[in-house]
């Protein structure tokens, strides 16, 4: 979803065939841990003629941020796994994924992540530490509260958090909070 949508948007903004070719070959990168989801994502990109699926079947958290930064990403989109973090495995908290994504982007890059609302508060000590590091090194621009049925049947209240990478959050910064729960859509189960 994210890569396909991003590719289509970028292609619509491109003026020349050379720009379109460059977008398809060099400007889209993705990481997927699960091999079955990786296969679906790669097939979708190939079917949409992306030219070169820069997808990797790997653990994104094992990638060194400096290594990923060399790809020159100016936008990061992420939907990390929900509710996987524990005291024994704090690296799996959503805030850990957010911090790693932001650290992996270029200076001034923008990131949008969709996570459970509860993860943004950071309840555990580990989550509080991730949150502190994020705010120390990056700026939270705003949070959009989504419809509770965005992920039908999951029972979570999703939000989209928007960040600017590598610009420390100013304590006087006014963040935008948008309530988009009434998005005008009606959820119909598997219709």
Segments (PLM) and residue ranges:
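Conserved S-adenosyl-L-methionine
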Residues: 1-78, 83-91, 95-96, 103, ...
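A conserved structural/catalytic subdomain of Rossmann-like adenosyl-cofactor enzymes
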Residues: 62-191
């Amino acid at each position: 979803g994210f890569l396909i949508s991003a590719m289509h948007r970028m292609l619509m903004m491109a003026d020349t065939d050379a720009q379109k070719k460059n977008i398809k070959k060099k400007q889209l990168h993705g990481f997927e841990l699960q091999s079955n989801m990786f296969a679906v994502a790669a097939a979708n990109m190939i079917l949409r003629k992306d030219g070169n699926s820069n997808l990797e079947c790997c653990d994104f958290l094992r990638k060194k941020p400096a290594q990923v930064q060399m790809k020159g990403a100016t936008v990061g989109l992420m939907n990390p796994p929900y509710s996987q973090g524990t005291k024994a495995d704090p690296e799996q908290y959503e805030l850990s994924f957010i911090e790693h994504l932001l650290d992996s982007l270029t200076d001034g890059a923008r990131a949008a992540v969709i996570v459970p609302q509860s993860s943004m508060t950071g309840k555990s000590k580990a989550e509080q530490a991730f949150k502190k590091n994020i705010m120390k090194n990056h700026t939270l621009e705003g949070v959009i509260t989504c419809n509770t049925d965005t992920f039908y049947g999951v029972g979570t209240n999703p939000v989209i958090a928007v960040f600017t990478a590598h610009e420390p959050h100013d304590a006087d910064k006014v963040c935008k909070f948008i309530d988009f729960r009434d998005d005008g859509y009606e959820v119909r189960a598997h219709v």
